[in-house]
Design a protein with these regions (language model features):
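Short, well-structured N-terminal submotif of metal-dependent ribonuclease cores
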Residues: 1-42, 57-63, 70
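Alpha-helix capping/helix-boundary segments
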Residues: 11, 46, 85, 104-105, ...
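Acidic, PIN/NYN-like endoribonuclease modules and their adjacent C-terminal/linker elements
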Residues: 1-3, 106-136
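Histidine- and aromatic-rich ligand-binding microenvironments
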Residues: 6-7, 42-43, 98-99, 121-122, ...
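Active-site neighborhoods of divalent-metal-dependent phosphate/nucleic-acid chemistry enzymes
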Residues: 77-120
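Residues that scaffold the ATP/ADP-binding catalytic core of kinase and kinase-like folds
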Residues: 13-15, 53, 128
């Protein structure tokens, strides 16, 4: 079965609906993936970019961003590498008020066995349980 990845712009058209034709085509792509024997992937960087755009360009609240990310993670037609990392990261992003990218990096590191992070941005990383933050 061929694999393909979906760009951030496709996800944003579905969410923002600023171009109805593109939004419908994007939804149809997701719905028809199984029938086409096609596996669709959303790359981790696309999840990060989606969150950034929703926060910076559309002023989504943290709670609204959380709802969007959870909806993406629960979309059966999309496969996301290390999905559990994103589930923990979005929860921490809201509950502990840290940057989403920092939460993803922290949990990605922990997922891969890294327990120490060297950073000048200690504030956010210190809020991730199990991660030892150090300055270079």
């Amino acid at each position: 079965m061929p694999k393909a990845f979906v760009d951030t712009s496709v996800i944003l058209r579905i969410l923002i609906k600023d171009d109805e034709l593109k939004a419908k085509a994007a939804v149809n792509l997701l719905k028809s993936a199984g029938g086409r024997d096609l596996t669709l992937y959303l790359l981790p960087v696309a999840v990060l970019e989606t969150v950034w755009v929703l926060e910076k360009m559309y002023s989504f609240s943290r709670k609204a961003v959380q709802e969007v990310v959870e909806a993406i993670l629960n979309t059966p037609e999309l496969k996301i590498e290390k999905e559990t990392v994103f589930r923990k990261a979005i929860q921490t992003y809201v509950e502990k008020n840290i940057k989403f990218a920092d939460a993803v990096m922290g949990y990605w590191g922990l997922y891969n066995g890294y327990t120490i992070v060297f950073t000048y941005d200690e504030k956010d990383f210190k809020r991730i349980e199990g991660l030892d933050t150090r300055k270079p």
